[in-house]
């Protein structure tokens, strides 16, 4: 047996550039998803930016406290976690709720990455499960809690349906490969 050892990213500036490009393009994604240029495009852009900024700052602080130094790579994942978490509710929450959603995503992504790496032992070098799966689910559920005109029960049904469908398809695929 060999000892597992992470291979650290070799070019943080290039990784940061990628995150900033994604952050910039997320405005088009969230604003464009409304399918109509209405009065609330500015609000959508603002909630998108606030959630990402809050997640970035909170992830930086959490990693600094937890590891004794800021983890820039994890902080970049925090920015993406905030963007993913706000996507479902960007048009139905206010600025303070967007800050809260981003801040929670910033904390959750750190512990989710550790959980999948150390407990579940899944090789996820970029933290995609934590960023997109966990923080996406979190954002979906927060839409039901904070979203104007949204129901938590409806969001929970959608979440359970998506997880169930994914589990069934993955189980079928696994048997097809054997």
Task: Label each residue range with its predicted role.
Residues 3-9, 69, 114, 118:
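Membrane-interfacial helix termini and the short, flexible loops that connect transmembrane helices
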Residues 6-11, 37-47:
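Interfacial loop-to-helix junctions that mark the boundaries of transmembrane helices
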Residues 9-13, 70-79, 127:
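Cytoplasmic-side transmembrane-helix entry/capping segments in multi-pass membrane proteins
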Residues 34-40, 87-96:
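Helix-coil boundary and interhelical linker segments in multi-pass alpha-helical membrane proteins
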């Amino acid at each position: 047996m060999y000892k597992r050892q992470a291979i650290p990213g070799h070019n943080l500036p290039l990784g940061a550039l990628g995150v900033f490009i994604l952050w910039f393009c997320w405005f088009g994604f969230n604003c464009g998803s409304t399918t109509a240029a209405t009065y609330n495009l500015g609000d959508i852009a603002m909630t998108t930016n606030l959630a990402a900024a809050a997640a970035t700052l909170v992830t930086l602080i959490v990693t600094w406290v937890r590891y004794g130094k800021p983890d820039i790579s994890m902080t970049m994942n925090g920015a993406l976690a905030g963007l993913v978490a706000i996507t479902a509710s960007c048009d139905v929450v206010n600025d303070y709720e967007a800050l809260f959603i981003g801040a929670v995503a910033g904390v959750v992504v750190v512990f989710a990455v550790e959980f999948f790496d150390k407990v579940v032992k899944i090789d996820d070098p970029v933290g995609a499960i934590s960023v997109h799966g966990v923080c996406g689910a979190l954002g979906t559920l927060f839409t039901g809690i904070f979203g104007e005109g949204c129901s938590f029960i409806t969001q929970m049904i959608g979440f359970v349906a998506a997880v169930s469908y994914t589990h069934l398809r993955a189980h079928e695929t696994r048997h097809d490969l054997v």
